[in-house]
Amino acid sequence: MKVKASIKADPSKGDILVRRSGRLYVINKKDPNRKQRQKGPARKK
C-alpha cells in the first residue's frame, strides 16, 4: 500500500475512494496493487 499526502482515484481503472476511521483510502478489487492511503491524524492510544 502506498502512503501519500494527497491521493487520487481513477474510477475508469476501478478505484474506489473510501473513508475509514478518519483516513482516506483508495481500494481497487481489479488491481490490488493500486491501494493507497492518505496520511491522516495520528492513531489514538
UniProtKB/Swiss-Prot annotation:
PROSITE patterns: RIBOSOMAL_L36. Keywords: Ribonucleoprotein, Ribosomal protein. GO terms for cellular component: ribonucleoprotein complex; ribosome. InterPro entries: Ribosomal_bL36 (IPR000473), Ribosomal_bL36_sp (IPR035977). SUPFAM superfamilies: Ribosomal protein L36. Coiled coil: none annotated. One of its GO terms (biological process) is translation. Pfam families: Ribosomal_L36. This is Large ribosomal subunit protein bL36. The gene is rpmJ.
